């Protein structure tokens, strides 16, 4: 999922290989579509989407970034990161941030072959990144739209990374002191 930034390139390449004509930066009027309709069976309107920052009261000096900026590596993250929204993208970005600074497969292989650390230490290095991550979801369930066959493993890995998961919790305000949330237990920062 981390390589989602390459999905667009892959889709474009695959479509072109299949002979799909891709027209960019052109307004498709109803007349254009009707006039050309004899040439194809279907029209796909891929209008795209733009991420938005929810209207949460916040101190403007507190940096807020989009999930896609995190995936693309352009977001500057602090030591403590709160992900607002526990849908599919929110959970995956929380897991991605939680993975930053953990051992890679090659590093683990090397360390196991040469027995550089005890097993317990290797587990710790695999499961604790450099960021403290929390994810806040208003609803009762995290990532409800992820395929059930893979959802459990994504949620399990997110928890394994030590991501604090708050469901049925609302973000009230973002301040310099932290993110103020509210749930049945009351307000907390």
Model regions: which residues?
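N-terminal Rossmann-like dinucleotide/flavin-binding domain of flavoprotein oxidoreductases
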Residues: 1-40, 144-169
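Rossmann-like dinucleotide/flavin-binding elements
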Residues: 23-35, 46-63, 68-146, 180-189
